[in-house]
From Swiss-Prot:
It catalyses: UTP = 3',5'-cyclic UMP + diphosphate. This is Uridylate cyclase. The lineage of its organism: Bacteria, Pseudomonadati, Pseudomonadota, Alphaproteobacteria, Hyphomicrobiales. Mn(2+) 1 binds at residues 323, 372. The keyword Manganese applies. Its EC number is 4.6.1.26. InterPro entries: A/G_cyclase, Nucleotide_cyclase. GO terms for molecular function: adenylate cyclase activity; metal ion binding; nucleotide binding. Keywords: Antiviral defense, Cytoplasm, Lyase, Manganese, Metal-binding, Nucleotide-binding, Repeat. Its main location: cytoplasm. Pycsar (pyrimidine cyclase system for antiphage resistance) provides immunity against bacteriophage. The pyrimidine cyclase (PycC) synthesizes cyclic nucleotides in response to infection; these serve as specific second messenger signals. The signals activate the nearby effector, leading to bacterial cell death and abortive phage infection. A clade A Pycsar system. One of its GO terms (biological process) is defense response to virus.
Length: 523
């Protein structure tokens, strides 16, 4: 397993040729677009097909510019559900997967009531966007619908948690809401056809959803759209994150008959919760129906289409998060300068090359793209056990390869010279499965402390840093630990990893020094 500049360059040029900037088909989500899509969806349903969201199955060489309201729903008690007496066990992983399946179903039930576009489920987070009614002049209507949707989703999750298995899956809920322009693009994952939305409002809504206090938290842009007083502070985001909204008690909302008419009644919430519970019983039943097996490495051979709750993987592995640092700002610049084709083409190439580096060069498995971030898994070992130390070494090499591939993309592509890639790595027992709506709208799911920690580590890195988590450091050979002073390595690319692992350290004792034996992956 190794990175090759020649192979990477060939792939990058091939990916760019498949979706050149000049050939990107850009659409605007306006009334004509929505009407055409609604007609297509209705015709497919009459022919026996399934219903689809208004924006769906966007081709890799296309993009849709959307004015919408972005809603991030965070399950606050997700982390505690993942452990049992401070330890991750098969039982605790079954419980947290059941919890996610149940709450994903509740969110989907409510989303249908508001024509909310489900974007992504990722661990404890759901991202949805309200895109209709489209066009300027409808900002208030979209904001009212988004707030009513957020209120309904929170209540439905609380209701289904309260009434299922004596509250075993109950959780507090926090929701962040923001509005603005974003670009809908292909998800990059063949079996998940909902598009990803790139741009500031999705990012900002996610930040508003961060925190320990439950409730619904709006940006000043949403407050403005709703005609509510905006918050004034030196730190606007902090003020918004501390200002919980009451859908029924807040001045300006309780008397807003248009908004109140959009809120779901208690009876409708109970119906949505009941349908989610029935879906859970049909597809999962109980925790015990999540059945785990090991997958013999390499993980690149995992077929997500074959995974179900009763056919799930669980094993020790490395979780890898790679995030394109500075990309949201780049998206906003491209929207403002009408360079969306450039951005979509560049993203297609970068994501494709990062995924190819992980899976082809280092035999890892991509789970999904989350905006401009890639989540992957990697392990070495046998059908009986994971080689933890070998997995750490392989993932560090993969991280180095991903950075080298990204830097090669910067050489080949225009406009991305100011971007970087932040990478987080951690080791732990981790389940891998598909949950949610059965069929082509089920979602890939891999959750564990290692997954959460690797994402946190990536979030704390700058665009030239790679971070290795404490569990991975504990399994790492000395040669790897030397690379990560304080758990973080700067500018760690394929060349520097290979050079370091191939060069013996100097061992000193008193006045005597000597070269230690070189690292041997078989030791």
């Amino acid at each position: 397993m190794s990175w090759s500049r020649h192979k990477s360059l060939q792939r990058i040029r091939s990916f760019r040729a498949s979706a050149p900037a000049a050939a990107i088909n850009l659409s605007n989500f306006d009334l004509s677009y929505m009407t055409a899509r609604a007609t297509t969806i209705q015709a497919r349903r009459k022919a026996g097909g399934k219903s689809e969201p208004l924006i769906f199955d966007v081709p890799p060489d296309s993009a849709v510019l959307v004015e919408g309201v972005h809603v991030y729903i965070q399950l606050l008690d997700f982390a505690s559900a993942m452990t049992e007496r401070e330890r991750e066990t098969e039982a605790s992983h079954r419980r947290v997967l059941s919890m996610l399946h149940l709450n994903y179903a509740a969110c989907d039930q409510v989303a249908e009531e508001f024509e909310a576009q489900r974007v992504d489920f990722h661990g404890a987070r759901m991202h949805a966007v309200i895109v209709s009614p489209p066009g300027p002049g409808n900002e208030r209507d979209r904001a009212e619908r988004a707030l009513a949707f957020a209120d309904a989703a929170k209540r439905a999750i609380e209701e289904v948690g309260r009434t299922t298995e004596n509250g075993r899956y109950s959780t507090r809920v926090r929701v962040g809401i923001d509005s603005g322009s974003a670009v809908a693009v292909n998800s990059g994952t063949q079996d998940e056809r909902e598009p990803l939305f790139l741009g500031a409002p999705a990012n900002y809504a996610a930040k508003l959803a961060e925190g320990d206090e439950e409730g619904v938290f709006m940006s000043n842009r949403i407050r403005k759209d709703l005609g509510l007083p905006q918050l004034s502070s030196f730190d606007t985001l902090a003020a918004e994150r501390a200002s919980r909204t009451s859908s029924v008690g807040e001045t300006g909302l309780s008397a807003n008959t248009s908004f109140q008419s959009k809120r779901l009644s208690d009876a409708a919430i109970m119906t949505a919760a009941s349908r989610a519970r029935n879906s859970f019983i049909l597809n999962v039943g109980t925790d015990a129906n999540f059945s785990f097996h090991r997958h013999t490495p390499p993980l690149s051979t995992i077929d997500f289409a074959l995974l179900t709750p009763s056919n799930s993987v669980r094993m020790g592995l490395m979780s890898i998060f790679g995030d394109i640092d500075g990309f949201t700002k780049y998206v906003d610049e491209c929207i403002a300068a009408q360079r969306i084709g450039e951005m979509v083409s560049n993203l297609h190439v970068i994501r494709s090359e990062l995924a190819a580096t992980l899976s082809q060069d280092f035999l890892g498995r991509k789970v999904r793209f989350i905006g401009d971030c890639i989540h992957g898994l990697l392990a070495t070992g046998t059908s009986y056990e994971t080689d933890a130390s070998g997995s750490v070494v392989a993932s560090v090499k993969a991280a180095g390869g991903m950075r080298s591939s990204f830097e090669l993309c910067q050489e080949e592509l225009g406009g991305i010279e100011n971007l970087g890639i932040a990478i987080g790595l951690e080791y732990g027992e981790t389940p891998i499965t598909r949950i949610g709506i059965r069929g082509d709208r089920s979602v890939r799911c891999s959750v564990s402390r290692a997954v959460s920690r690797s994402e946190e580590l990536q979030g704390g890195c700058t665009g030239d840093q790679t971070a290795l988590g404490p569990t991975a450091l504990g399994h790492a050979p000395t040669s790897i630990r030397r690379l990560f002073a304080g758990g973080v390595a700067m500018g760690l690319d394929a060349g520097s990893v290979d050079e370091h692992l191939g060069s013996p350290p100097i061992v000193r004792s008193g006045e005597v020094s000597a070269a230690a034996a070189p690292y041997d992956s078989g030791e």
